[in-house]
Structures are given as structure tokens and as C-alpha cells.
């Protein structure tokens, strides 16, 4: 039975449904994206080469459309199933059909379907089988004024007519108990009541945590031992990491976790009387709503039974179900936010500035067994390896001579040192050796994150079957400096460790997002067809792992590719794959100059006609010759404004790399460990991870420091990613060092403001400026500051809760 009718919704289309969730996406582009995707086009291809059809939608919008269509289809499929099931039962009214057909929210759909779901043998089902539904209907109707009891008629008297030994109803009390079970089910399955309860929890509910049975001392969850926060606040992506922290504490049994209304103040005791126990106002409000729904005639003799049913329906059925839904909603928002943070950080790392195709010497640091040294040539090919010892004076001297000789003879242009254990020590030795030998070769610290995973992987074994793990690691470190993207695609992005709570989120959703990011980065940069590994080629639009291996195998047998067109000779490389992939592949050795640009072969004909009209070779349109292309109104009309602009950009700088120019970076040479740090010390650093609560910065002491969000700038910062990104070079000031916890608090604020946290300002005011990076100047304090006091905002508050980095 339905207490009231929900308003019938207007017919909803996919476009209007998606536009409500993503108002920034223009409706006309949605159909084009879905049509192209249905034809087998990839997201990078649609974003790069079909801008005229989509209105230049970016990859984020295109993925939102494709993912949204999948969600829409699942909702429509569920609608169809529910309608069919209820119709099969002969209970589908026109009103119910309209409500189901007009509902595009899965929880609400399930609310409407709940009364008609096939049920297990519940107490209500047993009561119906015992013939007690008429008694339940009489109680309900009397309680709502639909029926007036006969003079002297009572619930007990009415119930006595239903006594039956055969049906196991021994007395009136048993009959009434069965009727109440039916009413409990009726109330708990009512869509309107469930919707109202859900809304109250989402709008006014609080997530609450208290100290759990297995709480440790000290505990990283101490801030949550007596904590509550509005569900509405935690549903905002920028705050959702706090819910993940609460959930992790609950899973580790250091916290209890529940939902409810705001905790009221403890009533004051008066004249020796014990204060009343505070009640949950949200629970009281919901109970009043359920009791009113169960009985509108308080003078009816059966009113207490109906109110009892209301209490039980609310507390035993509806609240647990709704709390699960709210937790699920909070988890989904938190998962999406954490995955987005991780994906953005991975993107920044993958697009780090490359040192370029130059010979590099890689150093995998080690104390006991020595540093493994590997040399790679300008193409990244492994040349040879050796060991450098750091511990003994004799070992250092001999290793130093050997190192200097390697650099001279190998034409080494840079030394890449892993930033793991003994990394700073190795860096110092290498610098001293090169300086003493008069060699002006940059020494660069390179992140080892994920290098050990690669070294032990099947990929590394296939690539270097006869080499030791540590030598593989040194090779990877050298190659990471040459081309971070080409080397990092060999590593599972999850092992790079640049997220927040990534081990707590859905593995499937995380992997899907990271795969999309890697694909996006590879296609954004482009791939040299003649040097790329099969792992890199696999991420090119339309290719995939199998075809990537076929390309490398063909290249090994036939030699380098001389044209994009020759790709069609590779087995299984179809015309459709060519369409999707060709524009992202570069061939420096090609006879056709456009084969080393991002211009798609489908546009060659237009440019060749233009060159013919101008009386110049096609190469004459590149570089300075692009001015004649810019002047061609006919070509602009033929290609469309978006494609024309992209073609001009490619012709201006053929084979351009969208990544920033590499600039060497050095740590302070007088600090190597936490013990070397002093309060107020200013240090250069590299941002290694950005989370919702701040940024982690490597200052060269084997332990990243935290710049809390309140210490990122003199201005209010809502999102740390507005200020910094992984790989950015920054200048930071040491605020606090906790040797016992191996924690460092840092600040990027000016000296006068570094010790005071400022509150939020009106939205849009004092927005921080642009981003830093390898190719840009450092950000943060540049002059020695006054001695700071302990910051008002505890910079370790979030650090203590972070795991899975």
C-alpha cells in the first residue's frame, strides 16, 4: 500500500539526464560521441581528430558521455526488468508504471520494487499464510479513519476471530502479533517513507566515530576518537578523504562508525537529579514521521500496536538499509575523488619533462652490496654495467676513477641516481668524483617508485633475462630520466604511490581510470614508431597489446618503418586500426614530412593540394612555411576551425613534444637526514604527491615532508592541485620535525605567515596563480625566515591518517 503518490516525472532522455549531472557538456556533442564510439573510435581519437563533430569536447567530457551511457543503459534495463516482474504478478497499475518509468535513480527504483520482490519466509509472509492480512487491514484502516470500529469492538475482540490451531494462531495475542508483522513490512517497504528517511539522512545526518575496541596508543586515528561530521559535507569530493580515514579506522577496529543526528549537548543536572539521557534528534524526528504514517487516530484502541509497528519498521528495517545506502554513497564519492587524485598525479608524472635521447648513466644506490651502475645509449639501449662501492675509502677511490672513465668514454650526458636508501650518499660521491675529474655532467635524483616492481616483473625478465634485478633497476632509473613516459608505462601505476587511500578504493574502478590516463598521456605525446617498445605501442589509440607485439616483430624482421602507410603491411593492421592509430605515431626517418607530425593522414590530400597550388613541396608548408597555410581561407573552410588550428600548430613545430623542457634539479648539499634539518631552514624540493589535504615534498632526506593545505600559500587554498602538482619544484620552509614518527612539517608561505593558518575567504578571491615545474622557477619562500612557532593547524593531522602512499 502506498501512502501518497509521487509526482509523475516528465519523459526523460539520455541527453537531458546526463545534462543534469554534467551541465558543462553541450547536448549536441553527446550524439556525435556516442555514434563515433559505437563505430569503434577511441576516446583519444575522438578528442583529437573529430573536434568538428563533437564541438571540440575534451577527453574528460567524452569519457563522461560514454560512462554515462553505460549507467543510463543499466538503469533502463533495470526499469524494464522491474516492470516485467510486477506485470507478471498482475499488480502493475497505470500509476505504478508511470512512477517506475519516470524514475532514473537506482535507489528510488529499488524502493518502488521492494514490495513486489520475491520474499524469503519472513514473519510477515507466515502471517499472511495464516490468513491474518484482513486483521492487519482492519487495524490499518481504523488507525487512519477509513473504518470506524463497531461499538465495544476492540483489537483483541477482532483478533479472536482469527484464532486457529491449524494455522498455528493459538490466541488473540498471536493473531495481533502476526498482523503487526504485516504492518511492519508495509511501512518498511513504503517508497515514500524510505525516500523521506534517505533525504533526512543525506541532508541532516552526521557520520560519527568513537574509540574502538582495538584502538592503539598512540593511534593514527586519534583525531576521530570522538568525532562527527555532516554527511552533506563529506559528500563533497574535497572532504571525502576524511570518510575514507574513518572507514579505514573502522575496518581496523580502532574506531566505531555510525550515522545519526547531531549529538545534543548533555542536559545540565538540576538539584541533585540525574540529567536526562540525550536523544538523537534525527531519530526522534523520523520516529514521529513513521508513527504519523502508521496511525492518524491516536484515540483508536489499536494505536499502540500501530506505533509499535512504526518503531520496529524504522529501527529494524528502514534505518539499517538507509544507513547502508548512505555509507555506499559516501564510499562512491570518496572512491571517485581518491581515484581522480591518483589519476591526476599519475598524469603529471607520466608527462614529466624528458632529458631526451642522450646517453645516461643510471645508479641504483646500495651500501652493503654497492651501487649498481648501468649505462644506456641515446636510444635507451643497455650498454653495460658495473658496481661502485661507497663504504670503504679504497672502494670509493677505485670506484671514482672507474666512474669518471665511464663518463668520459661513454659520452655520458647525465647521471641518474635513484632516490632510495643511500641515494643522497651516492649522489654526493658522484658529484665529488665528477667535479674532481673536471666533468661538467649533471647529476639528477630520480624517483625509484615502482622500480623494484619493474625489476622483478615478467616485462623486465623478457627484456633482460640474463641481468640481475639491481642492474635492471639501474637501467630503469637511467631510462626514466631519458623518457619518463616510455619507461613508466612498464610499471603498474598503482605501484608508483602518488595517491591517497588508493588501496581502499575499488580496484576495478582504479585500474580503469589509470588505464585511461596512461592511454591519454601516450597519445598526447605521440610515439616514435621505430623505437617504441610493444608496451608503449599497446597504449596507442586502436592498437592494443597483441597488435603492438606484431608491429615490433614486423619491425625486427623488415627493418624500420619508412612511412605510416607501410603499417598496413603488418598482419591484422586493418584500415580501421590505421584510422585510429596513424595520427599518434611518429616516423622521424619518413620520406613524407607529415609522417613525423600529429597531422592525420586523412588530411594529407588537402595539404598536398595547397602545396601544389602554392608551387612548393609539402615540406615547404612546415616551419616558417606555415604562414602560407594560415592564409588559406579555403583550407580553413574545408577542414573546419578546430582541425585547421590543430594542423597549423603541428606544421609550426613538426614533431613537437608537448612536455616541458628538462631543467636539472639539486637538493641542498648540507642536509641528508632528518637530523640535519633545523626549524626555519629553507630547502628546495620536488613535489612527490598531492592529496586533498596538502602536498608531500621530497627535500632529500629519505622522508617526504608534508605541506598542509593551510601552508601551501598566503592565500586561501580550496584544492591543493590549484597550487602544486607532482614533479613541481618548490621552495619550502621547515616548520617542525618529529624524529620519533619520522615526520616533517613544511610550509610554502611567506615567513611572516608560516606559523598562522588563515581561514577561508569568499569563493573566487585571492585565487593562487599558475603552476611550477621543472621548466619554471621555484615557488615558496626564498629568504631565511624568522624562527617559526608551532603552527596553529597541526600539519601532521592528515599525515597521521595517510596510508597506502
Region annotations inferred by a language model:
Residues 42-43, 54, 58-166, 384, ...:
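Accessory alpha-helical DNA-binding modules that contact the DNA backbone or grooves
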Residues 199-206, 363-367, 421-422, 446-453, ...:
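A glycine-rich phosphate-binding loop feature that marks nucleotide/adenosyl-phosphate handling sites
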Residues 19, 24, 353-357, 365, ...:
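C-terminal accessory/binding modules appended to enzymatic or scaffolding proteins
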Amino acid at each position: 500500500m502506498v501512502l501518497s503518490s509521487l509526482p509523475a516525472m516528465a519523459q526523460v532522455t539520455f541527453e537531458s539526464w546526463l545534462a543534469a549531472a554534467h551541465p558543462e557538456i553541450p547536448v549536441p556533442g553527446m550524439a556525435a560521441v556516442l555514434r563515433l564510439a559505437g563505430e569503434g573510435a577511441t576516446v583519444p581519437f575522438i578528442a583529437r581528430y573529430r573536434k568538428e563533430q563533437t564541438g571540440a569536447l575534451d577527453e574528460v567530457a567524452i569519457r563522461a558521455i560514454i560512462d554515462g551511457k553505460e549507467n543510463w543503459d543499466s538503469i533502463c534495463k533495470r526499469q524494464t526488468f522491474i516492470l516485467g516482474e510486477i506485470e507478471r504478478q498482475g499488480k502493475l497499475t497505470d500509476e505504478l508504471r508511470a512512477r517506475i518509468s519516470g524514475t532514473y535513480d537506482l535507489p528510488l527504483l529499488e524502493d518502488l520494487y521492494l514490495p513486489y520482490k520475491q520474499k524469503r519466509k519472513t514473519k510477515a509472509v507466515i502471517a499472511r499464510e495464516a490468513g491474518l492480512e484482513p486483521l492487519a487491514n482492519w487495524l490499518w484502516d481504523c488507525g487512519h479513519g477509513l473504518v470506524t470500529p463497531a461499538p465495544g469492538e476492540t483489537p483483541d475482540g477482532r483478533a479472536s476471530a482469527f484464532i486457529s490451531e491449524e494455522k498455528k494462531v493459538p490466541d488473540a495475542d498471536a493473531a495481533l502479533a502476526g498482523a503487526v508483522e504485516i504492518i511492519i513490512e508495509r511501512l518498511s517497504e513504503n517508497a515514500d517513507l524510505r525516500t523521506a528517511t534517505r533525504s533526512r539522512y543525506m541532508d541532516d545526518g552526521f557520520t560519527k566515530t568513537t574509540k574502538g575496541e582495538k584502538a592503539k596508543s598512540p593511534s593514527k586515528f586519534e583525531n576521530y576518537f570522538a568525532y562527527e561530521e555532516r554527511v552533506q559535507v563529506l559528500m563533497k569530493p574535497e572532504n571525502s578523504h576524511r570518510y575514507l580515514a574513518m572507514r579505514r579506522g573502522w575496518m581496523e577496529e580502532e574506531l566505531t562508525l555510525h550515522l545519526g543526528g547531531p549529538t545534543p549537548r548533555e542536559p545540565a543536572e538540576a538539584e541533585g537529579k540525574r540529567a536526562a539521557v540525550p536523544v538523537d534528534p534525527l531519530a526522534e524526528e523520523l520516529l514521529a514521521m513513521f508513527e504519523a504514517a502508521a496511525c492518524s487516530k491516536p484515540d483508536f484502541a489499536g494505536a499502540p500496536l500501530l506505533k509499535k509497528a512504526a518503531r520496529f519498521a524504522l529501527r529494524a528495517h528502514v534505518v539499517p538499509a538507509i544507513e547502508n545506502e548512505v555509507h555506499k554513497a559516501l564510499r562512491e564519492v570518496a572512491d571517485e575523488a581518491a581515484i581522480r587524485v591518483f589519476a591526476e598525479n599519475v598524469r603529471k608524472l607520466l608527462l614529466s619533462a624528458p632529458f631526451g635521447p642522450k646517453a645516461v648513466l643510471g645508479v641504483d644506490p646500495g651500501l652493503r652490496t654497492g651501487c649498481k651502475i648501468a649505462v644506456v645509449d641515446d636510444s635507451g639501449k643497455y650498454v653495460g654495467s658495473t658496481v661502485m662501492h661507497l663504504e670503504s675509502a679504497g672502494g670509493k677511490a677505485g670506484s671514482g676513477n672507474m666512474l669518471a672513465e665511464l663518463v668520459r668514454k661513454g659520452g655520458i650526458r647525465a647521471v641518474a641516481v635513484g632516490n632510495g636508501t643511500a641515494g643522497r650518499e651516492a649522489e654526493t660521491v658522484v658529484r665529488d668524483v665528477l667535479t674532481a675529474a673536471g666533468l661538467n655532467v649533471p647529476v639528477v635524483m630520480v624517483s625509484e617508485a615502482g622500480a623494484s616492481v619493474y625489476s622483478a616483473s615478467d616485462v623486465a625478465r623478457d627484456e633482460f633475462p640474463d641481468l640481475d634485478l639491481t642492474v635492471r633497476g639501474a637501467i630503469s632509473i637511467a631510462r626514466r630520466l631519458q623518457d619518463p613516459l616510455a619507461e613508466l608505462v612498464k610499471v603498474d601505476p598503482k605501484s608508483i604511490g602518488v595517491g591517497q587511500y588508493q588501496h581502499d578504493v575499488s580496484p576495478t574502478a582504479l585500474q580503469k581510470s589509470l588505464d585511461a590516463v596512461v592511454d591519454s598521456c601516450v597519445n598526447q605525446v605521440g610515439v616514435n614508431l621505430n623505437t617504441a617498445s610493444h608496451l608503449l605501442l599497446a597504449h596507442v589509440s586502436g592498437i592494443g597489446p597483441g597488435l603492438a607485439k606484431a608491429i615490433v616483430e614486423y619491425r625486427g624482421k623488415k627493418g624500420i618503418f619508412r612511412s605510416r602507410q607501410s603499417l598496413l603491411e603488418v598482419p591484422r593492421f586493418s584500415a580501421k586500426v590505421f584510422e585510429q592509430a596513424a595520427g599518434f605515431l611518429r616516423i622521424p626517418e619518413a620520406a613524407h614530412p607529415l609522417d613525423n607530425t600529429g597531422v592525420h593522414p586523412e588530411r594529407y590530400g588537402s595539404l598536398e593540394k595547397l602545396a601544389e597550388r602554392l608551387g612548393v613541396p609539402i615540406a615547404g608548408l612546415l616551419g616558417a612555411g606555415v604562414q602560407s597555410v594560415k592564409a588559406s581561407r579555403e583550407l580553413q573552410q574545408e577542414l573546419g576551425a578546430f582541425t585547421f588550428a590543430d594542423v597549423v600548430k603541428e606544421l609550426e613545430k613538426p614533431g613537437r613534444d608537448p612536455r616541458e623542457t628538462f631543467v636539472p634539479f639539486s637538493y641542498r648539499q648540507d642536509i641528508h637526514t632528518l637530523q640535519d634539518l633545523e626549524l626555519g631552514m629553507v630547502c628546495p624540493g620536488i613535489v612527490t604527491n598531492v592529496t586533498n589535504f596538502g602536498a608531500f615534498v621530497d627535500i632529500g632526506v629519505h622522508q617526504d615532508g608534508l605541506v598542509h593545505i593551510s601552508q601551501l600559500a598566503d592565500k586561501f587554498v580550496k584544492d591543493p592541485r590549484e597550487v602544486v602538482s607532482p614533479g613541481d619544484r618548490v621552495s619550502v620552509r621547515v616548520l617542525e620535525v618529529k624524529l620519533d614518527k619520522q615526520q616533517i612539517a613544511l610550509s610554502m608561505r611567506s615567513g611572516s605567515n608560516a606559523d598562522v593558518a588563515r581561514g577561508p575567504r569568499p569563493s573566487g578571491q585571492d585565487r593562487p596563480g599558475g603552476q611550477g615545474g621543472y621548466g619554471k622557477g621555484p615557488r615558496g619562500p626564498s629568504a631565511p625566515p624568522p624562527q617559526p612557532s608551532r603552527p596553529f593547524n597541526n600539519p601532521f593531522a592528515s599525515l597521521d591518517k595517510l596510508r597506502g602512499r
